[in-house]
Curated annotation (Swiss-Prot):
Its EC number is 2.7.1.39. One of its GO terms (molecular function) is ATP binding. The lineage of its organism: Bacteria, Pseudomonadati, Pseudomonadota, Betaproteobacteria, Burkholderiales. This is Homoserine kinase. SUPFAM superfamilies: Protein kinase-like (PK-like). NCBIfam families: PRK05231.1 (NF003558), thrB_alt (TIGR00938). It is an enzyme of class 2 (transferase). Pathway: Amino-acid biosynthesis; L-threonine biosynthesis; L-threonine from L-aspartate: step 4/5. Keywords: Amino-acid biosynthesis, ATP-binding, Kinase, Nucleotide-binding, Threonine biosynthesis, Transferase. GO terms for biological process: threonine biosynthetic process. Belongs to the pseudomonas-type ThrB family. It comes from Janthinobacterium sp. (strain Marseille) (Minibacterium massiliensis). Coiled coil: none annotated.
Length: 322
C-alpha cells in the first residue's frame, strides 16, 4: 500500500533476525493503495510481503492473520503468515504492528474475462464455507456503524446532489438493516475488499486472494456484492457486464447455493457495497494522511456505481434453473 512508515534495508536486516528467513537482501515499497505500508522483501530464502499496519492495533490483528492461516489450512489459496522463532505472527517495527506473509505467484488480472470471474466466484464461495467455523469474531470495521460515523464527516465536502444521494442512501441502508430479510442473510468472516488488485492469477489459473486487512464478520452477500462491483463492470462507466456477472454468480452458486433471502436482498447489497467504497474514497480524498507514494482513488467512480445500482435493474443472483 502507500508508504506511511519508511523502512530501510538496514532496518529490515536487524528486524528480520527474529524470523527463520535468512539475511535480508532487498526491500521495495509497494505504491498502490492507501491504508497500510507494504513492501516486497527478498531474503536468502525467497520473496515475501512485509506489512506495517497504520490503523489496526496489536489487539485487532490476530483476527486477520489467524483467519489467513485458518483458510490456508483448509485449501483456500491465500498468503501464509510467517511466525518468528517464538511463534509470533505480529511484531513491532518502528513502534507499529507488522507482519510478514508469503508472496503469491502470478499477477493481478486487471482486465478480467468471464473465466477469471468464474474462478473468483468459486473460490469466494469456498472461502466463505471454510471460514464459517473460524472461532474469532470481529465485526466488519467498515460496516454500517462506520458508515453512519463517516457520512456526516464527508457531507460538508459534497455537492447538493451528492448530499441528497448520501442522505437518502444512508436512510435506505439503515432501514434495510432492521428488516427481516437482512436478519435472514447468512454471515461469517468475509474478505470485504476483493478487488482485482487483491487477487493473483497465473494465466487463467487463480493463484490466490490476498490483503485480508479489511476482513470482518458480515453478510456473505455483501462480500459477493463488493466483488461483483469491481470485477464485473466496465471500469469507465460502472455498468455491469452481464456475461461476467453471470459467470461469477453461477460459479459461486454451484459451490454455495444462494438463498431466497439473498436473492431478495441482492440489489440492496450491491448498493451497500458501492456506498461503503464511495464513503471511504470521499474520506481519503478530502481528509488525506501524509505518506510517501500515496495514490488516492477517485470517489466519483463509486458515486457513479451507486447511482447505477439504484437506477438500473440488476441481474438476478440466481435463476430458478441455477
Amino acid at each position: 500500500m502507500a508508504v506511511f512508515t519508511p523502512v530501510t534495508l538496514d532496518d529490515l536486516s536487524q528486524w528480520i533476525t527474529q524470523f527463520d528467513l535468512g539475511k535480508a537482501l532487498a526491500i521495495k515499497g509497494i505504491p498502490s493503495g492507501i491504508e497500510n505500508t507494504n513492501f516486497f522483501i527478498t531474503t536468502e530464502f525467497g520473496e515475501y510481503v512485509l506489512t506495517i499496519f497504520e490503523n489496526l492495533s496489536f489487539e485487532q490483528l490476530p483476527f486477520y492473520l489467524n483467519l489467513m492461516r485458518h483458510l490456508a489450512e483448509r485449501g483456500v489459496l491465500v498468503p501464509a503468515p510467517i511466525a518468528t522463532h517464538q511463534g509470533n505472527l505480529i511484531n513491532a517495527l518502528h513502534g507499529k504492528p507488522a507482519a510478514i506473509v508469503s508472496k503469491l505467484e502470478g499477477s493481478s488480472q486487471m482486465e478480467p474475462q468471464a473465466v477469471h470471474c468464474a474462478a473468483v466466484g468459486a473460490m469466494l464461495a469456498r472461502m466463505h464455507i471454510a471460514a464459517e467455523n473460524f472461532p474469532i469474531r470481529q465485526p466488519n470495521l467498515r460496516g454500517l456503524a462506520w458508515r453512519n460515523e463517516t457520512a456526516p464527516i464527508v457531507m460538508p465536502y459534497l455537492s447538493d446532489s451528492n448530499k441528497q444521494l448520501l442522505a437518502e442512501e444512508m436512510a435506505f441502508q439503515n432501514a434495510f438493516a432492521e428488516s427481516d430479510t437482512y436478519h435472514q442473510l447468512q454471515n461469517g468472516p468475509i474478505h470485504a475488499d476483493l478487488f482485482r488488485n487483491n487477487v493473483m492469477f497465473s494465466g487463467d489459473h487463480l493463484t490466490g486472494f490476498f490483503d485480508f486487512y479489511f476482513a470482518g464478520c458480515d453478510t456473505w452477500l455483501f462480500d459477493v456484492a463488493v466483488t461483483v462491483n469491481d470485477w464485473c463492470i466496465d471500469v469507465e462507466t460502472g455498468v455491469l457486464d452481464q456475461e461476467r456477472v453471470r459467470a461469477m454468480l453461477d460459479a459461486y452458486h454451484h459451490v454455495r447455493p444462494f438463498t431466497a433471502a439473498e436473492q431478495a436482498a441482492w440489489q440492496t447489497m450491491l448498493r451497500a457495497g458501492a456506498l461503503r467504497f464511495w464513503l471511504s474514497r470521499l474520506y481519503d480524498f478530502h481528509l488525506p494522511r501524509d505518506a510517501e507514494m500515496l495514490t488516492p482513488h477517485d470517489p466519483g467512480h463509486f458515486e457513479r456505481i451507486l447511482r447505477l445500482r439504484i437506477e438500473q435493474a440488476t441481474p438476478p443472483l440466481f435463476t430458478s434453473a441455477g
